[in-house]
């Protein structure tokens, strides 16, 4: 069976952004309570991060501080390829909220032609 995991790209630069990643995490847990989550931190201000939340509220979740600061959009793909934590990944930013269950299943992928 194919294992689906989630990757959240996080960059906390103020208190609102700290709330965003937590809400993003909670939305995933609402619909996918047992799936693994990898949070990739891209050079956040750790003075603004709620460490109690990180240490006590996260389940089946790993937080990874990126060694490549400021690389943003490339980091989830790099670490997914490098770590292979799960078979299939849903990659989102820390301000994206999943509001319903998504059917990630597919029997095949057929590329479509692009007309110019």
Question: Residues of each region from the PLM?
Answer:
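ER/Golgi luminal nucleotide-sugar-dependent glycosyltransferases, focusing on the catalytic module
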Residues: 1-116
């Amino acid at each position: 069976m194919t294992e689906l995991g989630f990757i959240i790209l996080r960059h906390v630069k103020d208190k609102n952004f700290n709330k965003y990643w937590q809400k993003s995490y909670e939305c995933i847990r609402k619909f996918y309570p047992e799936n693994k989550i990898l949070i990739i931190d891209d050079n956040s201000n750790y003075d603004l991060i709620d460490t109690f939340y990180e240490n006590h509220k996260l389940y089946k979740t790993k937080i990874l501080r990126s060694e490549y600061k400021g690389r943003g959009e490339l980091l989830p793909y790099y670490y997914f390829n490098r770590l292979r934590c799960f078979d299939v990944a849903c990659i989102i930013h820390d301000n994206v909220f999943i509001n319903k269950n998504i059917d990630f299943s597919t029997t095949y992928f057929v590329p479509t032609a692009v007309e110019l």
